[in-house]
């Protein structure tokens, strides 16, 4: 029971914080939405490539 109560309070605080942030930085998000999307896509692609390459090298070595 104690555990359940703790998790419930945590989720409540998180929801409140998220709501406030959205209302505050709504205009900013609209302005830099394209830039953020492009950055995230590039980072994901680069990370995936490096991981695959490193895994292949390690396998060959071992």
Curated annotation (Swiss-Prot):
Keywords: Chromosome, Developmental protein, Differentiation, DNA condensation, DNA-binding, Nucleosome core, Nucleus, Spermatogenesis. It comes from the Eukaryota. PROSITE patterns: PROTAMINE_P1. GO terms for biological process: chromosome condensation; sperm DNA condensation. The keyword S-adenosyl-L-methionine does not apply. It is found in: Nucleus; Chromosome. Residues 1-62 are annotated as: Disordered. Testis. InterPro entries: Protamine_P1. GO terms for cellular component: nucleosome; nucleus. Protamines substitute for histones in the chromatin of sperm during the haploid phase of spermatogenesis. They compact sperm DNA into a highly condensed, stable and inactive complex. Belongs to the protamine P1 family. This is Sperm protamine P1. It comes from Dorcopsis muelleri.
């Amino acid at each position: 029971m104690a555990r359940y109560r703790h998790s419930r309070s945590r989720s409540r605080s998180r929801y409140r914080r998220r709501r406030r942030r959205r209302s505050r930085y709504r205009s900013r998000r609209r302005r830099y939405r394209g830039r953020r999307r492009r950055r995230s896509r590039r980072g994901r692609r680069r990370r995936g490539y490096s991981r695959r390459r490193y895994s292949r090298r390690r396998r060959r070595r071992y």
